[in-house]
Regions:
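Short proline/glycine- and basic residue-enriched helix-capping loop/turn segments at helix->loop/beta transitions
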Residues: 28
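A positional/architectural concept
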Residues: 1-7, 11-15
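Glycine-rich hexapeptide-repeat left-handed beta-helix
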Residues: 9, 16-21, 31-32, 37-130
């Protein structure tokens, strides 16, 4: 799990038989996401609530919408996967649009909010242990 990655409540990450799951730096994995390895998730990605990955590879800066399912597919950088999409192979993702500037800003806002929460937690912990 990369630096400043954000893994939220109720996320399930697992794999079988020694397969690996990697999550890149600054990637946000929202509530209730399921990741079934082997999976490789790049840097600066956003996986919205209840999305699922199964044996998938995501390049950098990908947005996966709520409830989307990606299985046995490789997605290129900056791909936007709409909520509820089902991607069963690479061709299913062809023609999808790129992540917009608005979505990029949202991902950055999430990253900043999570960093503030972490910093506040560390400060309160230091005070409690003093």
């Amino acid at each position: 799990i990369g630096e400043e990655a954000n893994i939220q409540d109720g996320v399930i990450i697992h794999s079988h038989g020694g397969a690996t799951v990697t999550i890149g730096a600054r990637t946000s994995v929202a509530h209730g996401v399921a990741v079934h390895g082997p999976c490789a998730i790049g840097e600066d990605c956003f996986l919205a609530m209840r999305s699922s990955l199964y044996s998938a590879t995501l390049a950098n800066s990908i947005w996966v919408g709520m409830g989307a399912l990606i299985m046995r597919a490789t997605l290129d950088s900056h791909t936007y996967v709409p909520a509820g999409s089902v991607i069963r192979s690479r061709p299913d993702a062809w023609g999808m649009r790129f992540v917009s500037n608005k979505e990029k800003r949202y991902m950055e806002e999430i990253r900043e909010a999570v960093n503030r929460l972490r910093e506040d937690y560390m400060k309160s912990r230091a005070v409690a242990n003093a």
